Amino acid sequence: MNEKELKAIVINIARMGGWLIHHDLPAMNIRGRWATHVEGDVGFPDLVLLSPHYGQLIFVELKSARGRTTSSQDNWLDSLGLAGIEHHVVRPDDLDFITHRLTRPDLYKN
């Protein structure tokens, strides 16, 4: 399963659980390069999920089974952890966990 397929599955699970979802879509520029027109530091996680019913916030970095995080992504994830913010690197093997996490937020404390 590639990252795009994984993203679609995780977003569908989040929607079923009533989460608000933010994802920046990359766009191809005139030179044929992929670019996301957002200002900020590189490596920002792929998804930001917010449960309006439980007041829970989760940042998600999506990776294929063999995908590796970059040093910029690791910096973001480490910084989120230092701030006490829930974050996960989600791979296809993590679908059971993320499904449970997003469909049963009542079982997780803030």
Residue ranges and their predicted role:
Residues 1-110:
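Catalytic phosphate/metal-binding cores of nucleic-acid and nucleotide-processing enzymes, i.e., regions
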